[in-house]
From Swiss-Prot:
GO cellular component, one term: small ribosomal subunit
Ribonucleoprotein recorded as keyword: yes
Gene Ontology terms: biological process: ribosomal small subunit assembly; translation
Protein encoded by which gene: rpsS
Official protein name in the record: Small ribosomal subunit protein uS19
Length: 92
């Protein structure tokens, strides 16, 4: 279900403040965040944001195509190791 248009996009205030501070000083630093729920804004373009996936921070370089998506979409939190193998082949 999509978010209501009257509410607008969500971004954590502390993350937005960090990115705006970097934009004012023209620095390119990695910003660590645990906020997977934040929407990517146009101000984030060109920055690298390290998004926490439950074990480590995954660096995500923000490009124009990512605007409007959530940060958590680019840092998968689950590792898929395949289905369990079928042992019928080894029994023969």
């Amino acid at each position: 279900m999509a978010r209501s248009l009257k509410k607008g996009p969500f971004v954590d205030d502390h993350l937005m403040a960090k990115v705006e501070k970097l934009n004012e000083t023209d620095k390119k630093q990695v910003v660590k965040t645990w906020s997977r729920r934040s929407t990517i804004f146009p101000q984030f373009i060109g920055h690298t944001i390290a998004v926490y996936d439950g074990r480590k921070h995954v660096p995500v370089f923000i490009s124009e195509d990512m605007v409007g998506h959530k940060l958590g979409e680019f840092a998968p939190s689950r590792t898929y190791k395949g289905h369990a193998s079928d042992d019928k082949k080894t029994r023969r």
